[in-house]
Amino acid sequence: MVLSSYAKINLSLRINSKRKDGLHEIQSYFCLINLSDKINLKKIKEKKDKIFFKGPFSKLVNKNKNSIINLFKFLRKLKIISNYYSVSINKNIPVFGGLGGGTGNAASILKVLLKGKISKSLLNKAESIIGTDLRLFFCKQGFLSNLKNITYFRKKKLFFILVKPNIRCSTKEIYSKVRKYSKKQLLSQNKINTKNKFINVISQENNDLQSIVEKKYPIIKKLLIAIRDEKGCCFSRMTGSGSVCYGLFKDQITAKKALNKLKIKFPSFWFSFAKTV
């Protein structure tokens, strides 16, 4: 069985507070995009899982401790599965990029093993093991109003150029430097019921982690300005804790033209075109 495991983009990211358990309460508009890892999953007779990574970003994956290993341990501990599996993952999504590749891999496998029937209780438990962004991969577009709740809205067709400088961002390190917090926001459906209205709303948002990463890596700020200045770019932003930066466009042709120009300016960086799924 071959699965497509999609990347996610944080269209906005507000850090509201730090909880007693050390996690941060956040809010985020987000979407899944068609940049994906390909997962080949099959049941095996052996009494040990076989997990392989290949592709352009496979060397950066921790082979001894990762989301797939953690997921299988978790499901067996709860006696949800008893079988063992061979898993081959072609890593097309950058690692240490803020695109949620590892968490998305676990979510894709979880959906298949549980046939899409995942209770809130199980999802909450799984998130504590896999990652707090796990639930995002069960929704193609939405608004995360807090760590446990997603508000759904009508999907918008959006186009992106993605750029990753040669930087690895540690999520733990970036969050540890958060000192300022943003007010919670309320979602008003009538303000985002069209594509243009939605883009207008999110263009006025921010990623609260972006300034922290820009301070540590000045190239991020330079890159975001270069993306923003391309013709047709609605806004540029960093996703998650970085280091992938993106520009949002209303149409595919304009986005691809901008992508080709930026490739000349930053020849050593990773680039990709993407659209919402």
Model-derived features: where do they sit?
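Conserved, helical-rich catalytic subdomain that frames metal- and/or nucleotide-binding sites
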Residues: 51-53, 137-235, 248-268, 272-277
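ATP-binding N-lobe of GHMP and related small-molecule kinases
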Residues: 1-97, 115-121, 160, 164-167
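Phosphate-handling active-site elements
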Residues: 77-86, 112-130, 251-262
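Conserved glycine-rich beta-strand-loop-beta hairpin in the small C-terminal domain of fold type I
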Residues: 242-245
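A general structural detector for well-ordered alpha-helical segments in enzyme core domains, enriched
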Residues: 25-29, 71, 126-128, 136-137, ...
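DPxDG-like acidic metal-binding loop motif
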Residues: 97-126, 136
